[in-house]
Amino acid sequence: MSLTLKHTLFALILTGSFYACKQEAKTEKIAEETGQVPGAGLLKSRYTIGDSLQIGFAGTVTDLQVNINGESASHSLKGTDSATVAFGMNKTGWHQLAVSGKAKGVAFADTLRFEMVSDIVPGEMKYTVISNFPHLPTSFTEGLEFHKGELYEGTGENGKSQLLKIDPKTGTALKSVNLDQQYFGEGITIVNDKIYQLTWQSGVCFRYNMDFTLDKTFTYYFQGWGLTHKDTTLMMSDGSNKIHFYNTEYEKTGDLEVYDQNGPVRNINELEYVNGYIYANIFESTKIIRIDAVTGKVVASMDMQGMVPANVDARRDVLNGIAYHPSEKLFYLTGKNWPLMFKVKINDQTTGSRVAKK
């Protein structure tokens, strides 16, 4: 992840943390200058899924209307200067709250933002190594995926990036194509017999035919990290806690913000969608998390430290390849410049436990 991106994310967190205080100060200033009470403020900006929102007003409020993300939300006034709002959604991340009504007979409308963290404490996934195979130690793995029983790999580094078709039992490349040296290859996925390959900082996604001839290129406006898909929806990570959704023509259709019970989970890298969940490795770690693909909640995690081969640079040559073989119901895992690929059975029944209510 770039330093600029880290600074941007940090600024967003600070903005959210102090939002309620800024809103209150703004309300007091307008009231002082105009003699009118203009609006509302959240008593805090971060909640846990299942919590109710607490809104404070500077005076008596009537005709209150509340919407969350454009949909009407049930609420109840507490006295004349505060209200409780039910959050009926089950999705983590930042949400928009629109409040309108009358305060001291003066109409007002405010738009506020709040953050929802997961109500799940992630469980611990267990894994069993079934076997291992050779893997090209020259491959700086960035993406790994099975398609119709055949294994494909995307690799990175400028001047070394490739798309490959791999014999998993021998580790040899059956077919390959090189990216131009200006491109640092990243994650791959295959939809409708088209191979998509991201680039890191170039903002370009290549789409290939199955014979590795170039079909089309697309552009995006942030870093490209991991890539997977559900049906015809592409799912892309950018190194933050966000997963972006696109259709097969790379038109944005939505996104998902990934959270555990403590807050956003960043450095999401390589992705693999399996049966309603996204498996993702956390950059510069040996950790794999399982994400609910609808809500954004991290429901389980596991540490693969015991699988890292000896004599690799543990800081540079990190875990970074996750492929699921649907007929075997097994995962194939490897890393950047690893000499081995592992066939692994993961306990996929772990779903975590509910956060205890205070």
Where are these regions (language model features)?
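Short proline/glycine-enriched turn/loop motifs at strand-loop junctions of beta-rich domains
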Residues: 57-63, 200
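Beta-rich, blade/repeat-based domains predominating
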Residues: 137-148, 181-191, 220-232, 263-276, ...
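Short loop/turn segments that connect beta-strands within beta-propeller blades
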Residues: 166-171, 209-213, 247-251, 292-296, ...
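Bacterial signal peptide processing site
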Residues: 21-25
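Conserved beta-strand positions in repeat-built beta-propeller and related beta-rich domains
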Residues: 153-158, 197-202, 236-241, 280-284, ...
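A short helix->beta-strand "capping" segment at the edge of beta-propeller domains
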Residues: 117-138, 168-174
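A short beta-strand motif characteristic of beta-propeller blades
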Residues: 128-134, 172-178, 212-218, 254-263, ...
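Surface-exposed, short loops/turns at beta-strand junctions within beta-sandwich domains
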Residues: 87-94
